[in-house]
């Protein structure tokens, strides 16, 4: 009998199974990374909200004039809090008075729609409103 070269069916099934497992592992790690980004952004939003509430508690009647730089100067935000290019998607953070001066808007740029939906869900019970447009997510407190 001649010595035949090639792959057996078992070898092919084994290789295909290993490739499938590797592809699944890659997919799972990307989901974990996105989850970490969403939660990191949520923590930063909470810090900005707390700083803004401290601004009001210090005797300011409305959020008029609130800014990241102002909150840092007043000591409500750490001096090393960076608003530019520092959110988990490489975009910016900003804080500003809402059209209602008793409310504040916190926005993140560079956010994808899936992450924006997850952020909105996280703040559904505590925010007055959330919106997403042109890669910018805004939450109002």
List each language-model region with its residue ranges.
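Low-complexity, S/T/G/P-rich flexible repeat/linker segments used as non-globular hinges
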Residues: 112-141
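Glycine-centered flexibility motif
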Residues: 13-14, 31, 36, 90
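N-terminal single-pass transmembrane signal-anchor helix
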Residues: 1-30
